[in-house]
């Protein structure tokens, strides 16, 4: 029996449009069934799963809730986490198929050193090693047991995002770069074949960034229009 691919999406209330367009793009391009779960912070708080105070340095509501995924999976099997400010253009099953039991986590291993200090809506842009690695993760949940509820709610942001909960970097595997192409950060030429776009600096769903990424912004609006097109 083929089980749906479990996908968890980090959601910020200011990015509802981005979230819904991402969800539509995922299942429109997928060759396999998907089980998509948006991570809604108030829901996690109401269930007693998340209680940490908001960090002034966190730019989104899901900065730390992403690390609850192994717990939500019962520390069994694999799952995908992704930020909501993305757009799928390729078959997410192809990413799912690169799972490797040798690793606890697999991700695109960017060398992203921000040149700016502020990003979308005036949020602080933080610079740290492994920047953006945690924005798209294949999680081997049985090997992520250190991510207990207490740890996720008390560890520092750097401990979480720099994967200090693993024994070492040897437990982090790579996936092809196109599965987390950073719009307006990485070489635009690489975007053409990228199966997953990521507006990490803020996307066209924000008024001040309607054209972020140029033609890629237009592509996002096309995807939005298709997702919400009424049947004639």
For every predicted segment, state its role.
Residues 2-3, 29-33, 72-80:
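Short, solvent-exposed loop/edge-beta patches enriched in aromatic
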Residues 2-14, 20, 30-32, 38-45, ...:
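A glycosyltransferase accessory/donor-loop signature
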Residues 15-16, 88:
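Alpha-helix N-cap/loop-to-helix initiation residues
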Residues 23, 27:
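Zn2+-dependent metallopeptidase catalytic core
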Residues 35-72:
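Active-site-proximal specificity loops/subdomain of glycosyltransferases
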Residues 49-57, 119-124, 189-192:
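Short, surface-exposed amphipathic charged segments that create phosphate/polyanion-binding patches used
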Residues 65-114, 138:
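GT-A fold catalytic core of metal-dependent nucleotide-sugar glycosyltransferases
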Residues 98-160:
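Conserved catalytic core of nucleotide-sugar-dependent glycosyltransferases
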């Amino acid at each position: 029996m083929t089980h749906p691919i479990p996908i968890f999406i980090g959601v910020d209330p200011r990015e509802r449009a981005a979230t819904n367009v991402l969800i539509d793009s995922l299942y429109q391009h997928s060759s396999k069934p998907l089980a998509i779960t948006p991570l809604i912070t108030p829901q996690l708080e109401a269930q007693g799963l998340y209680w940490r105070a908001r960090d002034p340095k966190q730019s989104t509501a899901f900065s730390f809730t992403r690390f609850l995924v192994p717990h939500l999976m019962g520390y069994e099997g694999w799952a995908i986490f992704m930020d909501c400010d993305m757009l799928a253009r390729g078959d997410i099953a192809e990413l799912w198929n690169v799972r490797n039991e040798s690793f606890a986590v697999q991700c695109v291993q960017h060398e992203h050193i921000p040149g700016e200090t502020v990003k979308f809506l005036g949020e602080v842009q933080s610079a740290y090693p492994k920047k953006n690695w945690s924005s798209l993760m294949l999680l081997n949940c049985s090997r992520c047991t250190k991510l207990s509820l207490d740890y996720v709610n008390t560890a520092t942001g750097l401990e979480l995002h720099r994967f200090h909960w693993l024994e070492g970097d040897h437990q982090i595997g790579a996936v092809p770069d196109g599965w987390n192409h950073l719009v307006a950060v990485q070489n635009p030429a690489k975007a053409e074949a990228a199966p997953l776009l990521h507006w990490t600096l803020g996307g066209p769903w924000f008024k001040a960034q309607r054209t972020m990424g140029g033609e890629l912004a237009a592509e996002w609006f096309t995807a939005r229009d298709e997702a919400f097109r009424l049947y004639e």
